[in-house]
Amino acid sequence: MGIKVGVLGAKGRVGQTIVAAVNESDDLELVAEIGVDDDLSLLVDNGAEVVVDFTTPNAVMGNLEFCINNGISAVVGTTGFDDARLEQVRDWLEGKDNVGVLIAPNFAISAVLTMVFSKQAARFFESAEVIELHHPNKLDAPSGTAIHTAQGIAAARKEAGMDAQPDATEQALEGSRGASVDGIPVHAVRMSGMVAHEQVIFGTQGQTLTIKQDSYDRNSFAPGVLVGVRNIAQHPGLVVGLEHYLGL
């Protein structure tokens, strides 16, 4: 049989999509579907080698600690990771040479490419802003994808020695200019009928560039998740961002 996979958050919408994708893959074997009321020991009992975690920010750290301590690698799509949480994961992984953790703000290949293209474009434009649009049930704002996109843009601008973005705003309603992520404005929209969408707008004298990405259903995440599951054994330790598995 193939790689033995457990899915955490298996009863959720994304979790159900991942369960179906694993079941349809000849090289993967689904050995555990873990819901909120299930014991994580089922992963060990059923010999899971890799878990996929689409749970909640409140649950994910406990899940990761358990998996790492039991030698199970993890592909994580759950949001809510800040620098402190990432450092904690690195600490747990110390000395665990055969365990990998992939944390990705987005597993849709189109979203990964949007982040990569945005970082490439950043040094050519005076201004950049990020708009993310999601369904109204999303718990966090702005999205991890938008934050990661803005951080990449800011890092590229810093590397290029660029000045702060021009903005003469003196009076504004609170929040009207969005959240500042490393100096890049990020705007969050929550609206019925949407799933997961992002626009990155760049501007300089006489021209603009808009990079736009849309995920119309949760099936868009499955191919990227399976890339992670199939390749995590070659990437021990913590990796943040699916682009590192795609050679981008």
UniProtKB/Swiss-Prot annotation:
GO cellular component terms attached to this protein's record: cytosol
Gene that this sequence comes from: dapB
Function: Catalyzes the conversion of 4-hydroxy-tetrahydrodipicolinate (HTPA) to tetrahydrodipicolinate.
Highest taxon above the source species: Bacteria
CDD domains per record: DHDPR_N
Protein's name according to its UniProt entry: 4-hydroxy-tetrahydrodipicolinate reductase
GO BP: diaminopimelate biosynthetic process; lysine biosynthetic process via diaminopimelate
Residues annotated for (S)-2,3,4,5-tetrahydrodipicolinate binding in this entry: H135, G144, T145
Coiled-coil ranges per UniProt: none
Pfam families: DapB_C (PF05173), DapB_N (PF01113)
Family from the record: Belongs to the DapB family.
Pathway membership: Amino-acid biosynthesis; L-lysine biosynthesis via DAP pathway; (S)-tetrahydrodipicolinate from L-aspartate: step 4/4
InterPro entries found in the cross-reference section: DapB_C, DapB_N, DapB_N_CS, DHDPR_bac, NAD(P)-bd_dom_sf
HAMAP family: DapB
Catalytic activity: (S)-2,3,4,5-tetrahydrodipicolinate + NAD(+) + H2O = (2S,4S)-4-hydroxy-2,3,4,5-tetrahydrodipicolinate + NADH + H(+); (S)-2,3,4,5-tetrahydrodipicolinate + NADP(+) + H2O = (2S,4S)-4-hydroxy-2,3,4,5-tetrahydrodipicolinate + NADPH + H(+)
Entry's EC annotation: 1.17.1.8
Keyword RNA-binding among UniProt keywords: no
UniProt KW keywords: Amino-acid biosynthesis, Cytoplasm, Diaminopimelate biosynthesis, Lysine biosynthesis, NAD, NADP, Oxidoreductase
GO terms of molecular function: 4-hydroxy-tetrahydrodipicolinate reductase; NAD binding; NADP binding; oxidoreductase activity, acting on CH or CH2 groups, NAD or NADP as acceptor
UniProt binding sites for NAD(+): G9, A10, K11, G12, R13, V14, G77, T78, T79, A104, P105, N106, F107
Residues the record marks as active site: H134, K138
Subcellular locations according to the entry: Cytoplasm
